[in-house]
Amino acid sequence: MLKPLWKAAVAPTWPCSMPPRRPWDREAGTLQVLGALAVLWLGSVALICLLWQVPRPPTWGQVQPKDVPRSWEHGSSPAWEPLEAEARQQRDSCQLVLVESIPQDLPSAAGSPSAQPLGQAWLQLLDTAQESVHVASYYWSLTGPDIGVNDSSSQLGEALLQKLQQLLGRNISLAVATSSPTLARTSTDLQVLAARGAHVRQVPMGRLTRGVLHSKFWVVDGRHIYMGSANMDWRSLTQVKELGAVIYNCSHLAQDLEKTFQTYWVLGVPKAVLPKTWPQNFSSHFNRFQPFHGLFDGVPTTAYFSASPPALCPQGRTRDLEALLAVMGSAQEFIYASVMEYFPTTRFSHPPRYWPVLDNALRAAAFGKGVRVRLLVGCGLNTDPTMFPYLRSLQALSNPAANVSVDVKVFIVPVGNHSNIPFSRVNHSKFMVTEKAAYIGTSNWSEDYFSSTAGVGLVVTQSPGAQPAGATVQEQLRQLFERDWSSRYAVGLDGQAPGQDCVWQG
């Protein structure tokens, strides 16, 4: 603990009675007081001059011009803060749009609900950029040659890379925080962008937390947001099933998510260490106890972002696991979840540990409150088959006679004539919906993703019946889930997987 430079003044103690002062005593006392004041004044001036010349070190995490995106180089705040922030917030007219990727050759039923295509949404979001684009991403692989594949389905990713280069050519700042080491060892995307002026930082999460940076979100101009399951990978646009959300014209939420981006950014400098306590400027004012309240297309809405792991949650930030459990705990009617992986264990520790936190929450909701639980899990050629006993165990709790309803299905994307594309053709979504709230995240459901891996979540609640022109966000997400649940690509655990598109064969 730092000691103060000087002690607080203490009132002098005087005797209860004193002899009367003589006139010359008063004069002498006055001269002494004046002399003391003069000495103090001269000393203060000397001290101020001395301190003025001493450079003061920045606080931990303070932004320095050489370390920040170009849009920050004239101060320690993003380009849109603080001069324009208040004015922009007054002009906020928040809008949330669900976005998704449907793999090629995976037709949905005619007239079924759908979200905006992800590739289209990303390109439109970049078209709105005027000052800066900040991207947090697990890895980058936007071109076919990145993985040695020549396939027309990579064209959308290549168009996205070209769009980003065009933004840099228009002097729009691009800052990227990505995980190190990376899965995309042969990708040149970030080198290409850096050569055009992009600022790239690799965050050594393995050294810092023994995890990875698994987040996937954008902050554009401190005003618009994308977040969801999709990586910066061309396969996420055409070969993998994804779901996310774009939020437009919502600077309060965008600048809150920007604080999470900044936690990654400051950890991307050489020899960075995790702080014991994050500085106040990283703190969030929005969380599950005090969410953002605003109008989304005129509809009263509450929303907040969560984050993981706990070490990357400054004061006020709700932990991602806590957000998931809170949404589950508030459900009274149903919990529908779509995730790529479901393990009530660790996935990347040896030996693995049992971790039934989410599993217990689903069981408690179904058994204790009669909540209808549906879990839709992805399966592809790279799926770990040891997941399926856990899924069967969860479904075994179901007992309609006792009003306990737990159903599990496996979503299988047919490989078809796309076998030349590795690590694709899978449901990669990570979302949950209840009658009260929508949760969209970036994490698979196992312990490591919440204890050591960097991820984010978005929790949104809209008032039923407050939107005469359309459904609430949670209703829209429920419709998308039920579309997938009732499709021919969703197979019950008591069924049989068609073809050779999944490691599990029923």
UniProtKB/Swiss-Prot annotation:
Expressed in plasmacytoid dendritic cells and monocytes (at protein level). This is 5'-3' exonuclease PLD4. Belongs to the phospholipase D family. Homodimer. It is found in: Endoplasmic reticulum membrane; Golgi apparatus, trans-Golgi network membrane; Nucleus; Early endosome. The exonuclease activity toward ssDNA substrate is Ca(2+) and Mg(2+)-independent, but it is inhibited by Fe(2+), Cu(2+) and to a lesser extent Zn(2+) ions. PROSITE patterns: PLD. The lineage of its organism: Eukaryota, Metazoa, Chordata, Craniata, Vertebrata. Highly N-glycosylated. It comes from Homo sapiens (Human). It catalyses: Exonucleolytic cleavage in the 5'- to 3'-direction to yield nucleoside 3'-phosphates; a 5'-end 5'-dephospho-ribonucleotidyl-ribonucleotide-RNA + H2O = a ribonucleoside 3'-phosphate + a 5'-end dephospho-ribonucleoside-RNA + H(+); a ribonucleoside 3'-phosphate-2'-3'-cyclophospho-GMP + H2O = a ribonucleoside 3'-phosphate + 2',3'-cyclophospho-GMP + H(+); a 5'-end 5'-dephospho-2'-deoxyribonucleotidyl-2'-deoxyribonucleotide in single-stranded DNA + H2O = a 5'-end dephospho-2'-deoxyribonucleoside in single-stranded DNA + a 2'-deoxyribonucleoside 3'-phosphate + H(+). Glycans are attached at residues 150, 171, 249, 281, 403, 417, 427, 444.
